[in-house]
């Protein structure tokens, strides 16, 4: 394992462009057993990273919700990040994930994983006690001050973190130099948030990227993709077609790809309910990936390893639809 790599200049918003894929943390066959240790499939981790880079992704995010940040041991996190960093070898930027239940633990993990070689961290707020706005803002200020060399991607998931990420929050985040990007859900308030946070590169979900780029082509230059874990060709094609459309004004193909993505996702969310999906996010996403067959996500780590069977059927159907898109857009 790498203990340390040579640091580069801290990333800025201008460095965040294109297709940013969010990885799972591949698991060993016994990972659902609480007695198991060392449950990360490091060989599969390295293979996925290499394949993503070969496909042309612009950046990698990890250890979010379906990356199982909540259920990995510290030793597993360290080994996983070391493997990702060793495999990337500086070819694309990489944000690990260090969300935890308190500021001190977040800072400890962030320092160590940045020292290993991650460029930044995708970071949500501690969620045991629901945060108000001043507390959330101070949390990010403290982490940025403690680890000034780390770029921060705000992990803006209201369901996961019991925080709404309101408009004043973004205005305050834009004042923190280390906050360079945000994993962003929905685009209903995007135009206003872009005005409030001029120094942040917002990453809409891949399904929203076409529409978001139409709202503000200059500011919306990147997106996050989980569907790429079912095969990255669709995300890469979307990136390229949106970029082309910005130059030509012809958005027809970009919209068609976006429509394909939305159709493939239609069975992933139980009853179309994001809140219900969020209860089983990890299991549904990993089932989707395994059904697609591009990678081996493996079983979920406890306690989030129980998922209603009919929900899994929808996720698997989505994975197969994404696999078909990957084949279509690989041609």
From Swiss-Prot:
Domain of life: Bacteria
Molecular function terms, GO-annotated: 4-hydroxy-tetrahydrodipicolinate synthase activity; aldehyde-lyase activity; trans-o-hydroxybenzylidenepyruvate hydratase-aldolase activity
Catalytic activity annotation: (3E)-4-(2-hydroxyphenyl)-2-oxobut-3-enoate + H2O = salicylaldehyde + pyruvate
UniProt KW Lyase keyword: yes
Keywords from the UniProt entry: Aromatic hydrocarbons catabolism, Lyase, Plasmid, Pyruvate
GO biological process: naphthalene catabolic process
InterPro entries assigned: Aldolase_TIM (IPR013785), DapA-like (IPR002220), HBPHA/CBPHA (IPR048038)
Enzyme Commission number: 4.1.2.45
Family designation: Belongs to the DapA family.
Identification of the protein by name: Trans-O-hydroxybenzylidenepyruvate hydratase-aldolase
